[in-house]
Every structure is written in C-alpha cells, then in structure tokens.
UniProtKB/Swiss-Prot annotation:
One of its GO terms (cellular component) is cytoplasm. The keyword Cytoplasm applies. This is Cytidylate kinase. Its EC number is 2.7.4.25. It is found in: Cytoplasm. Belongs to the cytidylate kinase family. Type 1 subfamily. It comes from the Bacteria. One of its GO terms (molecular function) is CMP kinase activity. It catalyses: CMP + ATP = CDP + ADP; dCMP + ATP = dCDP + ADP. HAMAP family: Cytidyl_kinase_type1. Keywords: ATP-binding, Cytoplasm, Kinase, Nucleotide-binding, Transferase. It holds the Pfam family Cytidylate_kin. The gene is cmk. Coiled coil: none annotated.
C-alpha cells in the first residue's frame, strides 16, 4: 500500500477562467481521466445558498450560516452537484439561489467558512478545482495551474448552443454584451480579481474541442508528475 502523503503534498490541478470558457466541463473530464476528486467552487456558493433557503436560515444570520456550511454534505461527480447525496445541479441555477449566494457572500465569516470547505476537498489521490481564484488564492501551491480562456465570440457561441439545447431562448448579441460586462467586473474587482496566477499555463480553447483541451491539461500534469 502506498504511504499517505502529507495533506499539502496531495496534488491539486487548478483550472481558472472567465465565464463560458469551458473550464467546468474540462475540469470534470480531467478529474475523471486521472481518478481525482472534483471541486466546482462556483457551485459550492450556490449549494450553501440553496441549503440556507431549504432550512429557513436568514441570509444575515452569520453564525447559523457558518455552522450550516461546516456541516454540509457536498459532492461533485461527473459534473453534477450533489447536496446530501441528491443531484441539485438544476436547482442551484435558479435566480433565487443566485441572489441568496450573492447575499451571503458579503459576510467575511461566511466567505472564510466556504474557503475552508474548498480546501477540504484536497484529498488523495488528488483534486481538480475549477473556478476563478483557485490558483491565485485557494490553492497557491497547486502542482499545475491552468488559466483557460477563449475569445468572447467563441464563449458566447458555446453559451448560446448550451441554452438552445436546454430549450431556452437566447440572443447571441445579448450574450456577447453580458460576457463582456462580466469579464470587466471580474477583472477589476478588488478581492481576488480574475487573472492568471504568475505560474499558470495559459490554455486558449477558442479553436480547441473539449477532448483536445482535456488532453492538453493531462499532458501538462503527466509531464510535471511523470509517475502519476
């Protein structure tokens, strides 16, 4: 049996990037390819928000929110977000849940509790974490940091295709405007602005398929950890 490595030596791959860059899909497939655990950091905030709504906890009851976050049973499998063993991937995308997530995130103790939960996903044999500040803030010692991007046109086209496939109406011009505005907000915010870590590898997926992007990340990891 292989000896257990110290917590800080358990390998982490971070995949950060802007909205609709495809980082969530790529992260899930990289984790599956390597047999690693998966963390969807954006979904974690929404899962906490959904749980607070279900249990009738006020968005301003900081102590109760922190305890709730500490006790949550959350898993991510094959791109699905599970709360207490039940898939809630669709529920956490509801507008009410998004609003609650933004409301509870203003409290510093709540953010600290969520950061601790994110770091607790670091378990053997390894972790793939996707988000916006995984490599710059949460896992600064990650063995591989990837910053995924794509042209705003490519990202809008992907989002448009996803929405149409799910039966929603979508306007490509509206999506382009929304993505540009979100990019500007994310890159200029004071706390953890969206930017690549200094030691991140840049992956532009504008002209890549999902499989090609996954293959590139796995190749980078295996080059860094040849006995993986």
């Amino acid at each position: 049996m292989k000896p257990t490595r110290p917590f800080h030596q358990t390998p982490v791959i971070t995949i950060d990037g802007p909205s609709a860059s495809g980082k969530g899909t790529v992260a899930a497939l990289v984790a599956a390819s390597l047999g690693f655990h998966l963390l969807d950091s954006g979904a974690l905030y929404r899962l906490a928000a959904l749980a607070s709504l279900r249990y009738g906890i006020s968005g301003d009851d900081v102590d109760a929110l922190v305890k709730l976050i500490d006790d949550l049973h959350i898993t991510f499998r094959e791109g699905l977000a599970q709360l207490d063993g039940v898939d809630v991937s669709a529920e956490i995308r509801a507008e009410e849940v998004g609003g609650r997530a933004s409301a509870i995130a203003v409290h510093a103790p709540v953010r600290a509790a969520l950061v601790a939960r994110q770091r607790a996903f670091r378990k053997e044999p390894g972790l793939v974490a996707d988000g916006r500040d995984m490599g710059t803030v949460i896992f600064q010692d990650a063995v591989l940091k990837v910053f995924m991007t794509a042209s705003v046109e490519a990202r809008a086209a992907r989002r448009h295709k996803q929405l149409i496939q799910k039966g929603f109406s979508a306007n490509i011009d509206d999506l382009l405007r929304d993505l540009r505005e979100r990019d500007e907000r994310d890159s200029q915010r004071v706390a953890a602005p969206l930017k690549p870590a200094a030691d991140a590898k840049l992956l532009d997926t504008s002209a890549l398929s999902v499989d090609q992007a996954v293959e590139q990340v796995v190749q980078w990891y295996e080059a860094l950890v040849p006995h993986a």
